[in-house]
A protein has these predicted regions:
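N-terminal Sec/ER secretory leader and immediately downstream segment
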Residues: 31-144
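Bacterial N-terminal signal peptides that target proteins for export
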Residues: 1-9
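Extended amphipathic alpha-helical interaction segments
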Residues: 152-235
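Secondary-structure edge/capping motif, primarily at the C-terminal ends of alpha-helices
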Residues: 105-112, 131, 171-174, 195-203, ...
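A cross-kingdom marker for long, charged
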Residues: 226-292
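Bacterial signal peptide processing site
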Residues: 22-25
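Non-transmembrane, amphipathic alpha-helical segments
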Residues: 86, 90-93, 105-112, 116, ...
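C-terminal motif of bacterial Sec signal peptides marking the signal peptidase cleavage site
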Residues: 17-20
């Protein structure tokens, strides 16, 4: 049996003064570059595959930080409703939406929607209790500290970084790295859903470039779902849809550059982003059980 490596990537922000009302996208991007430190933890997953592979999975906070610095604005009502937790019955659904709600929480925090972000943290706590991850909240009063610091953005983001770290540590300590892949898949789909909703009707080239960079994670999502133990129809169906999205992305003529991570975004038309959105939103709405 071969071990596959998953790299859990969390972002530690130094001086969190990135999102003041008067900031320009370019200034915010420089602030991110100056003040972030990547903390990488490598963990192991047992798998039956005959080859080793590394999975790089950025945090939901990192994804939204990248999109925010690229000019993504807050869209009221686009996130998953916090009271939808009762809709999710299987552990797979709960873990996916743990990721969805994590993405929504960070999106709200970075856009000064602190009251709504508190509701998302409560939804995450509900799902963590139902999936055996209550230790994230039991080890420290994260929710209580979050509510007490609701008016201090720097403190709130620091608490969110602590939440991300505790999630990663708990998963690693319990050898549940395959769980991390399901959570990240939900977070990735939600982040891309929000970003593509803006990009499909916008000429924001920086945002579009960042979205294409995130599309390169698709092979890791596919592999991450492939290593799931006791895969059921839900897992296989979602994996098949992500494969279809990856195939469409790879079929766009002239997009792939000379090396693995080189892409010519100039060949993309608005119709391509509309198709990306169509496929991502279909998956997102299915896993969140949202009405179209």
């Amino acid at each position: 049996m071969i071990r596959k490596s998953i790299v859990l990537l969390s972002i530690a922000l130094g001086i969190i003064t990135l999102w003041s009302c008067g900031s320009e996208a370019g200034t915010e991007q420089q602030s991110v570059e100056d003040n972030q430190e990547a903390v990488v933890e490598e963990v192991q997953v047992e798998t039956e595959d005959t080859e080793e592979a590394d999975f790089i999975i950025p945090s939901a906070l990192q994804i939204h930080t990248i999109f925010k610095s690229s000019g993504l604005k807050y869209i009221d009502g686009i996130t998953n409703a916090p009271d939808n937790t009762s809709k999710y019955l299987s552990k797979f659904e709960k873990l996916l939406n743990f990721g969805v709600y994590s993405a929504d929480m960070f999106y709200c925090v970075l856009n000064d929607q602190t009251q709504l972000s508190t509701q998302y943290l409560k939804s995450i706590r509900t799902l963590s209790d139902e999936t055996g991850m209550s230790g994230i909240f039991n080890s420290a009063p994260i929710l209580e500290r979050f509510e007490a610091n609701i008016g201090n953005k720097d403190s709130v983001i620091s608490i969110m970084l602590e939440f991300q770290e505790k999630t990663d540590v708990l998963i690693a300590e319990n050898n549940e790295e395959h769980t991390a892949m399901v959570i990240f898949t939900g977070a990735w789909l939600e982040g891309m859903y929000i970003g593509l909703d803006a990009a499909r009707n916008s000429d924001n080239e920086m945002l579009r470039e960042r979205l294409i960079e995130q599309m390169t994670i698709l092979p890791n999502l596919i592999k991450g779902l492939d290593i799931q133990p006791n895969k059921n129809d839900q897992t296989k169906d979602l994996q098949a849809k992500i494969v279809a999205l990856s195939d469409y992305f790879g079929s766009i003529e002239g997009l792939k550059g000379e090396d693995e991570y080189s892409y010519d975004v100039s060949v993309l038309e608005t119709s391509h982003f509309q198709e990306f959105y169509k496929q991502v939103s279909a998956m997102r709405n299915e896993i969140t059980k949202s009405k179209v």
